[in-house]
């Protein structure tokens, strides 16, 4: 992408963020805001996992720990992660939810529809939190654009307009509701709360639509590679 955009001298370090021990992060290294869509589904080596108090081969879980550590007190985070993080019962998931709820005010969970991130193949949520005080209440919003998302029909600003409006006051609606953190199971810290304001409807994409999307992505990737080869 940088070649195609004409960026000849990028100020980018080729390194593995996760190879940095959390114990080495000092106050001068911290930030006020972290916005990220970390890679999920990947696996990290055992020696890299040793850098984290909550060890997991899942890269997204390691990144989330890194982001929390990198925030200053009062710092804010907005992190994309697989929706299974909300309910998985493995030790790492439970411990990480506990860490998040006890060290940060997780004020918003945005439940994204299938197809939000093309090619990801999984449903995602966005966690919005502020580091410092523990979580008191969590506001949930189920994003429903009313259509199947795809490469030619992506999520847009209009789809997020209601979320942005309601989130300012954490208002209840047919798509949003608030949960007191005291009601979370203290053994699992399960965050997969059902919408109390209406039946939860699961929309499955047609197999043909999925196949068409895969074919379109293959064509696009082939075209990009062709252009890169011409530049080499």
Annotate each language-model stretch with its function.
Residues 1-9:
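Short, conserved SAM-binding/catalytic segment
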Residues 14, 19-232:
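A conserved structural/catalytic subdomain of Rossmann-like adenosyl-cofactor enzymes
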């Amino acid at each position: 992408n940088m070649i195609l955009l004409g960026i000849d001298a990028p100020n980018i370090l080729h390194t593995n963020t996760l190879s940095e021990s959390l114990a080495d992060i000092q106050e001068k290294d911290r930030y006020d805001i972290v916005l990220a869509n970390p890679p999920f589904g990947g696996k990290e080596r055992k020696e890299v996992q040793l850098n984290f108090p909550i060890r997991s081969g899942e890269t997204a879980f390691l990144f989330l720990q890194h982001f929390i550590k990198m925030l200053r007190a009062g710092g804010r985070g907005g992190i994309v992660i697989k929706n299974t993080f909300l309910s998985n019962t493995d030790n790492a998931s439970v411990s990480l939810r506990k860490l998040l709820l006890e060290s940060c005010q997780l004020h918003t969970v945005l439940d994204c529809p299938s197809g939000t991130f093309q090619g990801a193949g999984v449903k995602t949520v966005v966690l919005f939190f502020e580091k410092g005080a523990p979580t008191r209440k969590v506001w949930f919003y189920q994003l429903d654009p009313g259509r199947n998302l795809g490469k030619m029909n992506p999520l847009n600003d209009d789809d997020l307009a209601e979320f942005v409006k309601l989130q300012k006051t954490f208002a209840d609606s047919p798509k949003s509701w608030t949960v007191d953190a005291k009601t979370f199971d203290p053994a699992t810290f399960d965050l997969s709360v059902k919408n109390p304001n209406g039946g939860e409807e699961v929309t499955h994409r047609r197999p043909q639509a999925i196949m068409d999307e895969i074919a379109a992505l293959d064509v696009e990737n082939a075209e990009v590679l062709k252009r890169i080869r011409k530049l080499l």
